[in-house]
Amino acid sequence: GHAVWCARRLIGNEPFAVILPDDVIAAEKPCLQQMVEAYEETGGNMVAAMEVPAAKASSYGVLDINEDMGSMVSVNGMVEKPEPGTEPSNLAVIGRYILSPHVLKNLNKIKSGAGGEIQLTDAIAQEIGTERGVYGYRFRGQRFDCGSKSGFLQATVAFGLSRDDLRDDLHAYLTDLMATEKAAQ
């Protein structure tokens, strides 16, 4: 929340996007572009969302869904890292947001939350029930958690294999590597 608050003069009274860099998304149409189109439909605050297995829901912020409209859901609430078995849905919040300038006003009023920091999610949650509301958007694409070493490596391989100029060499290398690994077992 503090980083967004520091940008308030640049943002002014306009809707704005927040991109968390550890969430990398591969998509034919960029995730943020998909969300802008959805935002233009609703005018409401928008968070990217993806379905996760129940066993992994406790690792995410999870949406409490009011109404499911297909690619979008209206939100009753957000539960940060719910205890297993208590998650209100399997729809997890991912690091892409399009927010109204009202969120900045909410940030101005918020006291420090988790970890002694001003939490952006608290400011977004204050928009639930307003005329703007909060929506989850089920983006089309594949998300990689580059906040973990494994996720970073998965993204690197996936993006490498998606490129015409890298695919053949990378595929040959990975095939050889796996054959060597299997032979060593």
Question: PLM features: residue spans?
Answer:
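Catalytic-core segments of class I nucleotidyltransferases/pyrophosphorylases
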Residues: A17, V36-E40, M69-A172
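Alpha-helix boundary/capping detector
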Residues: A26, Q33, G129, L153-Q154, ...
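Intrinsic disorder at enzyme termini
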Residues: L170-Q185
